[in-house]
């Protein structure tokens, strides 16, 4: 007898009771119970990098910008390239970059709340501002390609965020120029709200990220996200998701239309979080065919406890197998933590 049901954070089961009967006529023999299919469903394996998912990127860094912080060409160099202590480019580093907002929108709402058209327009202007963010990534990528002799048609991947237009937002703003503000309670209006692309030579738009880290179980959310996934797919892009540890919706990620989902172990930021989060996260993502987020605290270079917590993610990659043949997404709490090692000053 097997019970399968979704259990999210702060949920559990007190008791299960099975009532059988002596008459076994019509029962399925265990040998014919298709247990191999059940086993495969519960052990899908890690999501490996492949051209069919996120256009092949395997190590994607989350690039948080804000109302008062943007990335320059110089900022991107140690993300794009492995640098020695003299700043010489020795190899590539991350091959994908996700642009997402840290903090609030200009309207004052958080990223996962009821953002409106002017917020999204501001976000696009920031991402594609001259000399900053995506534009800076393009010029930095050109330098790395030239130094390493990479093929002219090689492109680093970048991704844009889709922020949560709450279904009860009835005055989003006029997207399609028909003089009528879009109503996010209507799915046909949500289908119009798709981020824009820009033509680059050294970087390539490779997908969209659904920003909200948890999904409620309402039929409305299911339809909304699937509609957005359909829109991105029609344009040749993937929609993906990075849920927090055991967030609601994790076990149904594929049913929402995501090309992949990358779960956060959420071990590194809170010193009271148990080490078991690493193993449990690895077990869950392997069972569900997901990938993993590697997280590092901004205090890792100054406080030993946080540094050691980061090392547990790397050890877990060896112990549980997600170091190879698994997409990794990297959450850096403070800019520069991952690449301070190339500097000449002791840390």
Features from the language model and the residues they span:
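N-terminal catalytic cores of secreted or lumenal carbohydrate-active enzymes
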Residues: 33-188
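Active-site beta-loop-alpha junctions enriched in small/polar residues
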Residues: 65-68, 102-104, 161-167, 211-213, ...
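Aromatic, loop-rich ligand-recognition surfaces of beta-strand-rich domains
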Residues: 2-37
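Acidic-and-aromatic substrate-binding clefts and catalytic sites of carbohydrate-active enzymes
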Residues: 62-78, 215-222, 242-250, 266-276, ...
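Substrate-binding cleft of secreted/luminal carbohydrate-active enzymes
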Residues: 206, 246, 260-275, 279-347
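Structural preference for beta-strand elements that scaffold enzyme active sites
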Residues: 57-62, 91-98, 153-161, 204-209, ...
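Surface-exposed amphipathic alpha-helices with a cationic face
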Residues: 141-152, 224-238, 282-286
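Aromatic-lined carbohydrate-recognition surfaces of secreted/lumenal glycan-active proteins
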Residues: 154-171, 176-192, 209-210, 228-250, ...
């Amino acid at each position: 007898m097997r019970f399968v049901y979704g259990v999210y954070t702060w949920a559990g089961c007190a008791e299960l009771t099975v009532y059988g009967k002596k008459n076994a006529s019509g029962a399925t023999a265990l040998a014919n119970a298709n247990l191999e299919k059940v086993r495969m469903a519960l052990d899908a394996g890690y999501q490996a990098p492949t051209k069919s998912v996120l256009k092949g990127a395997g190590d994607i860094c989350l690039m948080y910008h804000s109302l008062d912080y943007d990335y320059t060409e110089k900022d991107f160099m140690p993300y794009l390239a492995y640098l020695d202590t003299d700043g010489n480019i020795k190899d590539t580093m991350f091959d994908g970059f996700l642009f997402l907002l840290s903090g609030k929108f200009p309207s004052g709402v958080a990223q996962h709340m009821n953002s409106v058209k002017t917020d999204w327009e501001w976000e696009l202007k920031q991402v594609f501002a001259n000399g900053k963010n995506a534009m800076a990534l393009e010029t930095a990528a050109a330098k790395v390609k030239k130094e390493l002799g990479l093929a002219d048609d090689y492109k680093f991947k970048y991704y844009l965020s889709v922020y949560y237009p709450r279904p009860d937002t009835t005055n989003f703003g006029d997207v399609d120029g028909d003089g009528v503000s879009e109503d996010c309670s209507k799915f046909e209006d949500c289908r119009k709200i798709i981020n824009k692309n820009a033509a680059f030579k050294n970087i390539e738009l490779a997908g969209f990220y659904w920003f909200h880290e948890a999904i409620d179980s309402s039929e409305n959310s299911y339809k909304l996200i699937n509609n957005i996934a359909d829109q991105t797919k029609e344009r040749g892009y993937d929609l993906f998701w990075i849920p927090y540890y055991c967030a609601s919706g994790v076990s149904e990620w594929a049913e929402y239309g995501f090309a992949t989902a990358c779960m956060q172990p959420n071990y590194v930021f809170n010193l009271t979080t148990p080490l078991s989060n690493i193993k449990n996260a690895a077990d869950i993502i392997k069972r569900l065919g997901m990938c993993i987020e590697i997280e590092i605290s901004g205090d890792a270079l100054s406080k030993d406890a946080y540094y050691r917590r980061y090392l547990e993610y790397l050890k877990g990659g060896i112990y549980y197998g997600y170091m190879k043949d698994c997409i990794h997404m990297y959450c850096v709490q403070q800019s520069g933590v991952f690449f301070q090692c190339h500097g000449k000053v002791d840390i």
